């Protein structure tokens, strides 16, 4: 929820520091990381850092340097990335192998963002949202009794199957869908989403996440739900509109994480600096050209038969939905020959585990 100052930090009882070293990397302009002048006194070009492939390249080089300086080439190595970091680690898996000759034991993606789906949009991207709508509506007690009376994990497979088997084909028909089929699909979408059949038809079966965050509780409390974690509630200036005024969950997290990390670094680690710790970094414009990270991970796995992949997603994450992540895993290796090396874990949480 919304913690009240003063903040504190406490030991994590589930820490793995007794069996592994954890190395956190802040890419340029996040945390305390900044560009510095080169040997000629010139500031490096942003293009060397702010892009899908540039980001992967310099971070792979940093990881090689760190591993060499600390003599950890014989150690097992796992890389983990959250949100955009999911895209990053998919690309790093191949970059590390082919450019740094560093072979990984595992890649872990937490709430990964697959821009092959998110940016392209269309029937698949839209339909993959439905199971997230189901999870959120269940949490807020907005589903029909036949679903609401069951546990979340009992009903999600139903919604997933409907999204793949029925909703994608229906959306793919666009304006040529038969009127009776459109009506039947809208009725079932209402059943699984907690939204009214009327608003679903008004959106021609293609209901955006942002509208869902605004609409689900509109006629009840009038509150909005969070983007990154739909358990959080927000209060907009007006109940009308098609998207929330702000991200309720994000304001809560920044409200607590920012003082905590600054206190810990300065008081516990005794690191003194006036430099601002960036919770978010200025990295735009970001070059998204030639994003082949999904294919890069497949090739890395093909080249390295010991490389395994773990995906962790929260059912209440509306930014990078859990079913989008499941879909991504299924598309990495269409042959299915490596499917036993993929593991998906879902959690009753949001974007942040």
Residue map of PLM features:
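Histidine-bearing beta->alpha loop at or near hydrolase active sites
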Residues: 112-114, 315-316, 341-353
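N-terminal cap/lid subdomain of alpha/beta-hydrolase-fold enzymes
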Residues: 1-48, 330
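Catalytic nucleophile loop
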Residues: 85-90
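Active-site-adjacent alpha-helix of alpha/beta-hydrolase-fold enzymes
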Residues: 318-341
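Alpha/beta-hydrolase fold catalytic core
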Residues: 173-320
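A catalytic-pocket lid/entrance helix-loop region that shapes and gates access to the active site
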Residues: 93, 97-191
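Alpha/beta-hydrolase fold nucleophile elbow
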Residues: 71-84
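Residue in the alpha/beta-hydrolase core beta-strand immediately N-terminal to the catalytic nucleophile
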Residues: 26, 78, 106-108
């Amino acid at each position: 929820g919304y913690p009240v100052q003063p903040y504190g930090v406490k030991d994590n009882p589930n820490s793995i520091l007794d069996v592994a070293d954890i190395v956190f990397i802040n890419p340029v302009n996040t945390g305390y990381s900044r560009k510095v002048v080169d040997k000629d006194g010139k500031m490096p070009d942003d293009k060397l850092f702010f892009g899908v492939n540039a980001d992967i390249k310099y971070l792979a080089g940093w990881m090689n340097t760190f591993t060499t300086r600390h003599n950890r080439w014989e150690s097992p190595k796992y890389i983990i990335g959250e949100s955009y970091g999911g895209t990053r680690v998919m690309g790093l898996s191949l970059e590390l192998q082919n450019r740094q000759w560093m072979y990984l034991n595992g890649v872990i993606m937490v709430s990964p963002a697959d821009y092959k789906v998110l940016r392209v949009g269309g029937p698949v991207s839209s339909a993959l949202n439905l199971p997230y709508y189901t999870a959120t509506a269940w949490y807020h007690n907005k589903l029909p009794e036949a679903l609401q009376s069951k546990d979340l994990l009992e009903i999600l497979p139903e919604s997933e199957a409907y999204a793949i088997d029925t909703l994608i084909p229906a959306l793919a028909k666009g304006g040529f869908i038969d009127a009776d089929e459109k009506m039947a699909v809208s009725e079932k979408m209402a059943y699984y989403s907690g939204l009214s059949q009327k608003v679903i038809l008004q959106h021609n079966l293609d209901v955006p996440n942002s509208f869902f965050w605004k609409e689900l509780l509109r006629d009840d409390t009038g509150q909005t739900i969070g983007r990154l974690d739909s358990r959080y509630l927000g209060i907009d200036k007006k109940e009308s509109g098609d998207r929330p005024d702000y991200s309720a969950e994000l304001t809560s997290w920044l409200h607590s994480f920012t003082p905590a990390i600054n206190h810990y670094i300065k008081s516990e680690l005794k690191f003194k600096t006036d430099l601002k710790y960036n919770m978010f970094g200025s990295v735009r414009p970001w070059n998204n050209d030639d994003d082949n990270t999904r294919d890069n991970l497949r090739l890395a796995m093909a080249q390295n038969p010991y490389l395994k992949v773990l995906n962790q997603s929260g059912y209440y994450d509306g930014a990078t939905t859990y079913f989008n992540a499941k879909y991504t895993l299924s598309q990495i290796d269409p042959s299915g020959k490596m499917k036993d090396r993929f593991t998906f874990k879902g959690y009753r949480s949001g974007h942040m585990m």
